[in-house]
Amino acid sequence: MNFDASNDRPLKKRRFFVDDPLDTAVTPAEKSPALDASSSASTHTDPNYSANGSPAQIQTQQEYNFSNGGHATQPATAAGTRTHQAQSPAHDTLSDFDTEAFVSIVGEQVSPETLSQIRKLSDGSLEKAINVYFDGSWKNAGSPGSSQTTLLSCERNASRPSPLHTSREQGTGPAENGADSVTEPISRSKLQPARRYLGAFGVEAWATRSGIGLIKHGDTVNIERARSQPLSTRGRTGKLRVNQKGDVLTRFTNTAGQEIGRLPRETAEWVSTLLDQKICEFRGVCVFAPDRLRVNDTIYLQLRCFMRIEAFQPKELPQKQDDNRATTIFEQEESAEEKQLRLRQVALVQLFDEIGLKSTTQDDEIKKQRKEGLLRAAEMADQEAKKLAKSGNTDSGDEEPAELEQDQLDALYKKAQSFDFSMPEAQPPSSFAMDLRKYQKQALYWMLSKEKDKKSGREVSIHPLWEEYDWPLKDVDDKDLPIIEGINHFYVNPYSGELSLDFPAQEQHCLGGILADEMGLGKTIEMLSLVHSHRNLPPTQSLGNLTRLPVSGVVPAPYTTLVVAPMSLLAQWEGEALKASRNGSMKVLMYYGNEKNVNLREMCSAGNAAAPNMILTSYGVVMSEHRTHQALAPGTSWTPGNLFSVDFFRVILDEAHIIKNRRSKTARACYDLKATHRWVLTGTPIVNRLEDLFSLVRFLRVEPWNNFSFWKTFITAPFESKEVVRAISVVQTVLEPLVLRRTKSMKTPEGEPLVPLPKRTIRIEKVELIEQEREIYNHIYTRAKQTFNSNVAAGTLLKSYSTIFAQLLRLRQTCCHPILTRNKAIVADEEDAAAAADQDSDLKDDMDLQELINRFTATTSDAESSNEPPDPSMKFTAHALRQIQTESAGECPICSEEPMIDPAVTACWHSACKGCLKDYIQHQRDKGVQPRCFSCRADLNPQDIFEVVRYQSPNTTPTEQTPSSIGGDNVYSSSQPPPPPRISLRRINPLSPSAHTSAKIHALLAHLVRVPAGTKSVVFSQFTSFLDLIGPQLTKAGISFVRLDGTMAQKARAEVLAQFTKFETFTQEELDQAESTSAPSGLTPTPKTPKQSSSPSSPTVLLISLKAGGVGLNLTAASNVFMMDPWWSFAIEAQAIDRVHRMGQLRDVNVVRFIVKDSIEERMLRVQERKMGIAGSLGLMGEGNEEERRKERIEELRLLFE
């Protein structure tokens, strides 16, 4: 009978059926020579053997001899002797190999070459030699891909101790001392034998064979793996996939290598892990077995566990960890390495529980709580893995990780935001050129205390993640065990499965933290004050005294702070750093683009007096250089001078929520940056999940919370188990010592606001789509709703979520401009056709009125000068255009309204109200007749109807006046009339698709033309293609603007921000004159010298994409914000608004959010309310199960399609 394909024990068969044919069993008589030989060998080898000892006692002594190379039954007198025996057991035991006994047992002649090979593989053990021979593993022992069913001697040999590397996923190595570049050998492993007894436990195994005399009381059995399947396999794309069907079959065999039975699944699940990962070896003794054995009978075994030396040697994870990224879009799916760690830690916890091994450093209650938490976290991970395997990852929509509600976030921040206003203040040094507010000085004091809190005199204590265990002194039979001098304890990290013989000391706690002040409170300035206040100054030395650097390895950079920020903020950091520093007190290096061609190892070394004080770089550069750093082969004799070759004095991550995904390449790169002090700047430490905070804690290397297994045990698992209050309480404990957070809504004890900011007004303006836009919107909406209804009926709503979401995107784009939903190639062809038509016609989409008057007047003058008869049409055209210019066109010939309302002009230059003219043409077309001019009866083409657009006169501001004109010394100051306002004729229905305006663009222009002089505005949109359409309309309206989006290089972004944030500066005389001529209210220019008043005026509008400019930027030069389209979460929009309404803003801020009436955008506002918790759900009752979250998402979709 074959049981290889089954993991579970078969059901008991009924006894009255005919028994299976009995296998030919080895009779006691046939076995006796081997047993006698083995027994005699054991008796001869073991001086402590008693003549009346039981077989179990004999086996116990054999195991001790086996585990210590045959020479450790008596404690050695010198450590050196024990070290030699542990390292070379084969050398001492090969001479004891009984060849005659081996040949007699196997029953056939064996060649000398084969015999020699088997002796080497078995380390001279007759028992192992028999197993090796019968299972055939000696034939392919050298093949790396062979499947082993028994433990070979090559696995038992203690390999050479490797340097102590600690996985960064745990970040809690037993001997880490803060210097990642220093590696020390595991010295105690040289004293440790290849195997050492740990304990014993009983198990009820089951038989897989039938027979008589197969096994009896006292017989020795070998515990082996039936076969071992890899935890990860390569998929079609070449990427590693986690094998969710882990094989746990564990068999036991007799001394002849025959399989007798298997361990029960509940035991095999963790025993197989310990065998596969070479942590333990098990030897079994039969306690009870039926004389007549049948399949599925219960066999009682006593298993003795021996810890292998390999278990104490660190495991190196693969370098290319990014290949293990799961195919799902969510970050919670575990990788192959994480599954190995999970199985290892669970196996060790179960083993220690079975053998009754207790930690010496913890009481029973704490031990119990830790065990329960570990097993619960592991069980949740296992259930998640099985669920993903069952679904095949085809529908990841239901697997979205639980998110935090707004009130839960408020609860998390409650302790962090309980700011002590009586905290002492710290004054920055004289090299710092700015004046700090009180709360900023308090922040400086807090940051200095975090960085300088070394506590070097404290006593050494064990690492909080590790537990200490004593090696047992007696075995299960109360016999004395060998004592290894100097190794009385071993240490276990149950959260990572690591083991160590060296004492894992508690490392220096985090010398940094999280500065989480709300956006706009000046985190950048606070951090710059810290850079000035706590830094090492390079010594003044000549070039000849420079220290020679090694060609490889990491070099310390004691004078340099590294700042990692989004590309858009690099220029702002550079400007703020120089602005906040006295001349010559700060050297800033921009490490980006072509400026990366420097060797940081040499530039930032301790011997370089010219080392930069601050290096600015982007997250993209860090990720790119980390890839190069990982590609270097281990032991490379050369190290490139990049960011990972330097141990910085301080590392600062700005907008650090970028690394919230712990498995992203950017996050992994940032984890590997080396620095003494580590800081995180973010206004949102937790975006929407608890694991967002873990990534920051891991970067800061806050122990023990930077261990993900520990985090899952005490935070993630309780939260997912609906113990939300407990999980939040633990997170508050983590946050309290790490985070400093103040908000703009805080008030001082005197009742004053923490930061006095001007008033902010947010107004929603409903926009009505024009008829053509509404038709397009209704068409797309109908298709989207049909798709939604059909999927609801079929029950496949979430499987088609991406399709529905794409149609929602089209609806949102239609609200902005219909052209955004059209095929780009077709639009480009229409643009070319419109341009060609403009070239062939005298009528353009947009014509300047003054240029038309000049052209027709010149034609009439030329005719008069040449004595030709004048063209009456030319004279009429010039006259009609002048009437439009002087606004004296009279009453409307259609409605008799005087003056005309929004005058429009036909191609024959007759004027009427725009609304009247459009209705007149539509009336003619409804009657089925060709529209004709209401005045001259000429044919009317709807494409050739022009509206009159009047632009405001150039604003008269102090910057446009010279001091001489103000003082009256210029004789032309009062005689020069102001330039006339610009007027243009613009097609109502342009030929060019991009020239068409939309309801939102029209509403935006209506606001911008009413903006007071000297006031700047910021226009946000998440669609850069929409910004492409807004720009030309601003140009036509005579509004100067600049643009910033994600496609621009860093230097171009810096130039745009410099132009937009540039303020005009005036003299005192100019200010007095401005006040006397009703200067715009709220204008607060800075008095400067007269020569600065001649600088050209800066743009008044900044077009910016929501993603590129939503965070970090300082846009206080503006006071008007226009949000062209809503986002799913208002928090994203609030971040963008806070770029303007922040510290440094002197004017009231007006925010207008354009929302299309009766559209998807109005329903998005209701979704925002749900996400903000306004809908009434407290959320403290837990996130619910998957079915509840599924219903919630379906309800949101229903809300969008009401």
Swiss-Prot record:
Residues 1-10 have a biased composition (Basic and acidic residues). Residues 1-90, 137-187, 382-403, 952-981, 1071-1097 are annotated as: Disordered. GO terms for biological process: DNA repair. Residues 1003-1198 form the Helicase C-terminal domain. SMART domains: DEXDc (SM00487), HELICc (SM00490), HIRAN (SM00910), RING (SM00184). A zinc finger (RING-type) spans 892-937. Residues 504-703 form the Helicase ATP-binding domain. It is found in: Cytoplasm; Nucleus. It holds the Pfam family HIRAN. A motif (DEAH box) lies at residues 654-657. Residues 37-90, 143-152, 952-967, 1074-1083 have a biased composition (Polar residues). PANTHER family: DNA REPAIR PROTEIN RAD5 (PTHR45626:SF22), TRANSCRIPTION TERMINATION FACTOR 2-RELATED (PTHR45626). This is DNA repair protein rad5. The lineage of its organism: Eukaryota, Fungi, Dikarya, Ascomycota, Pezizomycotina. The gene is rad5.
